[in-house]
Amino acid sequence: MDPARVRLAGLLLAVGATAWAAGTVIVGDKIQEGIQTLDTLTGMLFVVGVFALVWTVLSTRGAGDGWTRVIPAGLLVLLPGAFLLNALSFGYASHDDFPLPLMILDACWPLSQLGMLVLGITVAVKGRYQGAVRWLPLLAGMWFPVTMVAQIFGGSTVSVYVSAAWLLGTHAHLGVRLAVRPVR
């Protein structure tokens, strides 16, 4: 894969993760009240960055050559659904107000995050990347479970800061590494 494209993917991931981390902290506990415009917009930037990462993993065969290519390919189907859900959520006060088609589309978010965990495991096991780039996708894939544990044991405020820190420490970190030294 062209190193310039990998650099761009890294830049998109770093910017998207940083934007969503900042948006998460700024919105804070208000996210519990319903859909927040800043969180939605920065979440869309994050999805664009994650899509670029997954495309890079597929293109560089980071998940392997065999049946494991299905993992990033599946994510390339789910992530546009997550993006579309965010785009279509404007005008609704909360997720409870969604019509049935949006409720169905809403499944793309948690399914894509589960897929990111599976992708992270696969990238780590396959070992096609070296150093931190091998392990950061696994840590990034743990964002959803870590954030949920923080929510359960620490509450909403703790979860906000854990989420932002995890996004910066894993997704943004990985994005910067890819932008500086692209994998092939």
Give the location of each predicted region:
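Hydrophobic, aromatic-enriched alpha-helical segments typical of multi-pass transmembrane helices
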Residues: 1-184
